[in-house]
Amino acid sequence: MIAGALTFLLQTLGNLFVIAVLLRFMMQVFRVPFRNPFAQFVVAVTDFAVKPLRRVVPGLFGLDWACLLLALLVEFAVVLASYWLDDFPFGLAGARVWPVMLGLAAVRLLSLTVYLIIGLTLVRAVLSWVNSDTPLMPVVYELTEPFLRPLRRIVPMVANVDLTPLVLFIVCQLVLMVP
């Protein structure tokens, strides 16, 4: 019972941190202005881990590889700790288990990225109806527009309603179904 609660806490806190690191990476890739309060919060939450790693892992091709590596390492640690708390026999599994665990962490990282895209798109849709002047809107707009823009060329507006977020939800759900 305690192991289940610890696993839940570990996965929740670990995944929240990984989402913050992924947000930071996406904000850099999509050139989101960092003067926004939400962007400053994400940077403040992740700086303690990203800055030291940046000294070791350089950026390449305009991408901050330190953020991606950090997200993968944290997810790897969460996977290992979760299996350890569930009494997985690491000693019997041998050295072949480590690449499998790393692959599982990579798949979970991709899954979290897709869920992040779904969440950001949902926030954008709700904010467009409720309060489009909130300081969060420019960040959410810049993070979701690269995914919605290509769909707008394919999906026409129906009665002045943009259905591309719905199409993006469906595409993301299909991606999550792929084994």
Features from the language model and the residues they span:
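Selective transmembrane helix interface/packing segments
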Residues: 1-179
